[in-house]
Amino acid sequence: MSEYEELLDKFDKSDMAGWTRRFFDDLESAFQRDFGMIEENDWHGVLCVGMGGSGAGGTYLSTISSKAAGLPVHYWRDYGLPSWWGPEWLVIATSYSGNTEETISSVEMALGEGGSVVGISSGGRLEDLLKESENSVHIGVPGGQMPRSAFGHLFGTQLSLFWCMGLLPAPSNQELEEMIARLRSSAEEWDPLVGTKAVDAARHI
């Protein structure tokens, strides 16, 4: 057993290193999902709501969309909704547990004002709320992980949703395969159990 493996065995009781290595599997799995059941609409924009790691994808989507999308995409990390929001804005609510208090508050407000919500979670109150709404959809992701380790599932699902709804230009299957391959190769170079870059960098700190 290497020194690095000994450290992991001693301190990484939740197997974050293992979950991190499986990030690309989670991402690839999410990219292969089909969201054809979600109808297109004449949205004025998209508001991504979520907290912490569950909300991080909204930040990335906002940045990506500012360069490539035809609609404005904003994110919200708080209770309720911004004062300018109206039901002509689609709400995409992400909460890994499905029970995040702030996110549930945003969803309840959106539904109460006649809005449409796409929710992404592993279950919880978010799923229950959206099952009761005719204008909303819940998309499930695998549970059983720590929220911070589930970013591949969450962001991959968000991005796939944007592609399927035509909110962002969708890459070809070949482009997706090449992207995943590049990410895996780069990650392996920095994985102390596989490559040497991380160890070499640590020695210079």
What are these regions (language model features)?
Residues 26-42, 191-204:
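A short, well-structured juxtamembrane/interface segment
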Residues 36-37, 41-188:
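Glycine-rich phosphate-binding loops that contact phosphosugars or nucleotide phosphates
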Residues 9, 16, 147, 172, ...:
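Alpha-helix initiation/capping motif
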Residues 12, 16-19, 23, 154, ...:
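Alpha-helical structural motif
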Residues 10-13, 67, 131, 197:
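Context-gated lysine
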Residues 1-2, 13-17, 100, 104, ...:
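Short, structured coil/loop segments at alpha-helix boundaries
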Residues 1-3, 130-136, 200-203:
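Compositionally biased, low-hydrophobicity segments enriched in charged and small polar residues
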Residues 1-31:
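Cofactor-/ligand-binding subdomain signature composed of acidic, glycine-rich
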